Amino acid sequence: MTLDVSIIIPERVFWEKRVEEIILPTLSGQMGVLKDHIPILTGLDIGIILVRQKSSSDWTSLVVTGGFALINSNNVTILVNEAEFGSEINVEQAQISYNSSKHALEMNKDIKRKFELTLNLKKARARFQVTQLKK
């Protein structure tokens, strides 16, 4: 038996697959989900979703920017603001974005902008980290 996973962004259903295992970036840390998981609704942080598809040892990685996951009856429904496949992210651009986001936060003197810059850094970090998983 497997899990039916749907990742939904505001514009459309981004990705639907039958998978063996999924690891989610929840607000309280990473959470692995296998078949027959207890029902749960959890908040998702900016981070990396890892998915192992049926009959495979390979993992698919996606970067998501916050949202929710509902796990019920071997269905995983993920609602996020943005999603992007790790395999489609340019390594050099991700590193440049990460470094510039980090620098912008370090140089920030405006308390009001700190929250926005912190979110930008988390997203840039996740995009850069997912490129390192491809190696």
Curated annotation (Swiss-Prot):
Q: Which Gene3D superfamilies match?
A: F0F1 ATP synthase delta/epsilon subunit, N-terminal (2.60.15.10)
Instruction: Look up keyword Transport and say if it applies.
Output: yes
Localization (cell): Plastid, Chloroplast thylakoid membrane
Enumerate the GO terms in the molecular function aspect: ATP binding; proton-transporting ATP synthase activity, rotational mechanism
- Annotated coiled-coil positions are none
Matching SUPFAM superfamilies? Epsilon subunit of F1F0-ATP synthase N-terminal domain (SSF51344)
Q: Which InterPro entries match?
A: ATP_synth_F1_dsu/esu, ATP_synth_F1_dsu/esu_N, ATPsynth_dsu/esu_N
Q: Which Pfam families match?
A: ATP-synt_DE_N
Keyword line: ATP synthesis, CF(1), Chloroplast, Hydrogen ion transport, Ion transport, Membrane, Plastid, Thylakoid, Transport
The reply on keyword Nucleotide-binding is no
Which domain of life, per UniProt? Answer: Eukaryota
Provide GO CC annotations from the record: chloroplast thylakoid membrane; proton-transporting ATP synthase complex
Name the membrane topology term: Peripheral membrane protein
Regarding protein family, the annotation reads: Belongs to the ATPase epsilon chain family.
Question: Could you describe the subunit structure of this protein?
Answer: F-type ATPases have 2 components, CF(1) - the catalytic core - and CF(0) - the membrane proton channel. CF(1) has five subunits: alpha(3), beta(3), gamma(1), delta(1), epsilon(1). CF(0) has three main subunits: a, b and c.
Q: Describe the function of this protein.
A: Produces ATP from ADP in the presence of a proton gradient across the membrane.
HAMAP family the record matches: ATP_synth_epsil_bac (MF_00530)
Q: What is this protein called?
A: ATP synthase epsilon chain, chloroplastic
Which species is this UniProt entry from? Euglena gracilis
